[in-house]
């Protein structure tokens, strides 16, 4: 299991755009229902910082880049971010119904 955490801070004036694009992306994921991944995005209390967690099962290719809505979200993010996003792999040491 591979888990990636992405941390993004967006410009306050783009929060509505970010969240609308994220909703479209997650709706597309719900429709496509790709197997072998789990993906979530959360907004932190400051209102402009987001954390996304992506788990991809071993042996599964990341299906996100195949979704037009994901590519549109990634493209928009270039304009919406206040600073470059950071990402890092996580090592899961325990989980209850999360991963």
Tell me the role of every PLM-derived stretch.
Residues 2-9, 51-53:
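Active-site-flanking beta-strand signature of metal-NTP-handling nucleotidyl enzymes
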Residues 3, 38-39:
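Short hydrophobic/aromatic beta-strand element in the GNAT-like acyltransferase core
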Residues 9-20:
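Short, surface-exposed ligand-recognition loops at beta-strand->loop->(often short) alpha-helix junctions
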Residues 14-16, 60-61, 95:
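Residue-level signal for secondary-structure boundary sites
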Residues 24-37, 54-89:
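An amphipathic, aromatic/His-enriched active-site/gating alpha helix that lines ligand/cofactor pockets
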Residues 42-44:
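Short beta-strand micro-motifs enriched in acidic
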Residues 46-50:
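A short, glycine/Asx- and small/polar-enriched loop/turn
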Residues 91-99:
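Short, low-order "capping/linker" segments at domain edges
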């Amino acid at each position: 299991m591979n888990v990636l955490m992405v941390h993004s801070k967006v410009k306050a004036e783009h929060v509505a755009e970010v969240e609308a694009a994220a909703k479209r992306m997650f709706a597309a994921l719900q429709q496509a229902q790709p197997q072998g991944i789990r993906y979530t995005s959360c907004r932190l209390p400051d209102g402009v910082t987001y954390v996304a967690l992506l788990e991809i099962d071993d042996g599964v290719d990341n299906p996100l880049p195949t979704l037009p809505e994901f590519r549109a979200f990634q493209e928009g993010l270039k304009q919406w971010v206040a600073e470059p996003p950071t990402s890092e792999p996580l090592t899961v040491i325990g989980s209850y119904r999360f991963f």
